[in-house]
Amino acid sequence: MTALATEVRRGPGYWLGGYRAMLRYDLLNMRDFLSFFLLIQVLMGAGMAIIYGFYFEEVPPLAATFIATGAPTLAIVPVGMTLVPAAVAQYKWSNTYDFLWSLPVPRLVTAASNFTIFTVLSVPGFVVTLLVAAWRYDLDLAVSWSIVPAVLAASLMAVSVGWGAAHAIPDPRITNLLVNLVIFVVLLFSPIAFPIENFPDWLASLHRVLPFWSMANVVRAGLTDGLVADLGRHYAVLAAWTVCAWTVAAWVVGRRR
């Protein structure tokens, strides 16, 4: 008798093969939206960098530095915390959500593909926003190598939180409401483009726990010299939010049948 060949569906080779397949699938599935995503990212980041300057008759140097170094963070936030939930909500509205989970790849591969695409997608808008902001305020920023882990940490945290929340919330309408709330809070009540000392104590204390201030500070530390203190604490805040988001994501993935 001839032994039947069986396909090994475990191990690093199978996982990496599924990861490459999901990357291709997701890129093809989102190809019509990627340019739109980038446009929104640039408009929110570079657009706010320009608009904030109109709040001053003459922008003081420190204020200009905060705006120019905070604007790139504003370009990162919408990718992870608005566009990722919107993409997941679209799957649910179009009744392809269950199909996504039925694909013959490990479920964590589906999450890893999304994390990779949206984290990388944050980079072009970040760069464009930084260039526009530096031009608008005529600044010579002290860009250092630490900007690389800063952008990756901030982007991964935002994508992780957006992905975990979007999958954990069953009703896409609620997801859409929360997305709009996040944008409202980030634009009006987050110390991203100005010092946290401008806030009352209770709101400043809240933002020391929320991720937005820490996102801005790790990015700002990679663009300036001596403006950010206690950088390790800010990375710890981002790491805590990322781990919590991954825990939620693992729970969501694990309970799918």
Show the residue positions of the predicted features.
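Small-residue-enriched core segments of transmembrane alpha-helices in multipass membrane transport
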Residues: 68-77, 148-161, 181-188
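Short hydrophobic, aromatic-rich alpha-helical segments embedded in or entering the lipid bilayer
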Residues: 2-3, 8-24, 192-235
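Transmembrane helix segments
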Residues: 56, 168-209, 213
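Hydrophobic alpha-helical transmembrane segments of multi-pass membrane transport proteins
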Residues: 47, 51, 64-136
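Transmembrane helix-boundary elements of multi-pass transport/secretion proteins
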Residues: 10-15, 25-92, 142-147, 177, ...
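Transmembrane alpha-helix boundary and packing residues in multipass membrane permease domains
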Residues: 49-54, 130-134, 163, 167, ...
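Alpha-helical transmembrane segments and their short interhelical loops
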Residues: 107-108, 112-179, 227-247
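Transmembrane helix-loop junction
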Residues: 53, 57, 90, 134, ...
